[in-house]
Amino acid sequence: MIKYKNMKNIIKKFKSIWWAIKLFATRIHYGNPSKKLKVVGVTGTNGKTTTATLLHKITTALGHKSGLIGTVEILIGEEKFKADSNKPMPSTTPDSVSLTKIFAKMLTAGCEYVFMEVSSHALDQNRVSGVNFAGGIFTNLTHDHLDYHKDIENYFRAKKKFFEILPEKAFALSNADDEHGLAMVERRRCPAL
């Protein structure tokens, strides 16, 4: 039996390569539907579900068809998204392959807007890579999820990454009442409120 010193790194790289191939194949089939939608991501420790849901409901009430991706449910207009299996969604923010499929279904259904929760885990694991965001919203940052991030600095960096990847034409909205609010939107390419 051959033993490699860095077997964990080799496996991690293989998984990354395999994931990239899977995403590439998905994009060949579906294209990048997020480019044809106005996708607004909401990140923060608390308030993601409420904020995304309210934006979805308000936009729908104004006569625009929108989608919602979050912890509680995924909605395409007012219809609940039917996953490929009967299992519930495993995380707040689905992986990039699943997101591409969901965005494609939303686009086919006539959605103009998508409001989605963007978790720190998703940002750290690059689950929103390639999503063309029209805007990003920061709610707050508290000392939750430190089991995953180890300390508040790592948690902050994971959330901040979201605002650094927003395109120039997007917008950033940050809660200035939160002690991390102003720092969260530094080093961004888009306008911030």
Please tell me what each predicted stretch does.
Residues 66, 113-114, 191-192:
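Hydrophobic anchor at the start of a short beta-strand
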Residues 76-80, 84-86, 144-149:
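A short acidic, helix-capping loop that chelates divalent metal ions and anchors anionic groups
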Residues 85-116:
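Conserved nucleotide-sensing/catalytic segment adjacent to the nucleotide-binding pocket
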